[in-house]
Amino acid sequence: MRADTRDFRALFLGDAPLLDTRAPVEFAKGAFPGAVNLPLMSDAERHKVGLCYKQQGQDAAIALGHRLVSGAVKAERVAAWAAFAQAHPEGYLYCFRGGLRSQISQAWLREEAGIAYPRVIGGYKAMRGFLLETIEQAIAECGFVVLGGMTGTGKTDVLRQLDHGLDLEAHAHHRGSSFGKHATGQPAQIDFDNRLAIDILKKRAAGCRQFVVEDESQAIGSCSLPFGLYQGMQRYPVVWLEDTQPARVQRILRDYVIDLCGEFTALHGEQDGFGLYAARLRQSLDNIARRLGGERHRRLAALMDEALARQAGDGSVDAHRAWIEPLLTEYYDPMYAYQRQAKAARIVFTGDHQEVLDYLRGPGRALP
């Protein structure tokens, strides 16, 4: 039998299959990428055992757990674990702290199914602690460069072409602006942290000593950046990306109209999907109504409605340029110009896509 492990680094670098025996409610609050939740106890069973533990102590709680998970219920859960173990012989199982739940699951697998399957010592809590420490170590030990630029310049496009780029928006599943929501929801905060940490771990293992991050607010939608990283981003050197106005409009059209519509229609079908997409686009504009001002919001909303009507009629998206262009020039550009001025002393390079890529791939990688 493979030994139980506490080598968290190897687990995450190797994308080891992980069998999570915590209750569904625990799993929903945060998990590791690719982990499969096959719980020892349901949420209701866990709640009953927890009450028993508080009122009568550990022995009584363990006895109740064995009564609740017995017979056909036990056989069904062991069968699910056995199927996972057979499909993923290189995997591991764990519970919250690496204690009784994973030990019981491990013992039942061995006794009932004849499968010796290793567990993670310390469980979810220890693995989560390791990942948070991974982020903190990177902030303390690595160099960071912030990639800035006006809305629509393609900062994310550049970032994804860099081996040492950390795509915070991808981990948050959000494009980082008032229009940044996707058709599907964002991960839990814990999931965001875990994804970012594993990305950092793998890139450092591949030899990265410096990272490039996109200029972001402290929150990307509902996901907050690690506090130490956000603090650092207020002092790290900045590389400023520039592009032409037509190219920026085209990129916004691609991301927030063409791609977003495609996401909704793929999930919900042409008719329902288009309706949900149109509602999302209108809501995104409404979210900044107060900052736009009443008259400007009404003007842009009317242009958006006209563009949506034309898109619904013949599939054309060109009319969306009529609201995208003034949204950039009248709202986003003045805001970003102010931010650029505030960062002026930290800007170490300015250029177009290829120039910025060449600079960030160079031996100095923007370190002052």
Curated annotation (Swiss-Prot):
Residues 12-136 form the Rhodanese domain. It catalyses: 5-methylaminomethyl-2-thiouridine(34) in tRNA + selenophosphate + (2E)-geranyl diphosphate + H2O + H(+) = 5-methylaminomethyl-2-selenouridine(34) in tRNA + (2E)-thiogeraniol + phosphate + diphosphate; 5-methylaminomethyl-2-thiouridine(34) in tRNA + (2E)-geranyl diphosphate = 5-methylaminomethyl-S-(2E)-geranyl-thiouridine(34) in tRNA + diphosphate; 5-methylaminomethyl-S-(2E)-geranyl-thiouridine(34) in tRNA + selenophosphate + H(+) = 5-methylaminomethyl-2-(Se-phospho)selenouridine(34) in tRNA + (2E)-thiogeraniol; 5-methylaminomethyl-2-(Se-phospho)selenouridine(34) in tRNA + H2O = 5-methylaminomethyl-2-selenouridine(34) in tRNA + phosphate. One of its GO terms (biological process) is tRNA wobble uridine modification. Its EC number is 2.9.1.3. The keyword Metal-binding does not apply. The keyword Transmembrane helix does not apply. PANTHER family: TRNA 2-SELENOURIDINE SYNTHASE. NCBIfam families: PRK11784.1-2 (NF008750), PRK11784.1-3 (NF008751), tRNA_sel_U_synt (TIGR03167). Belongs to the SelU family. This is tRNA 2-selenouridine synthase.
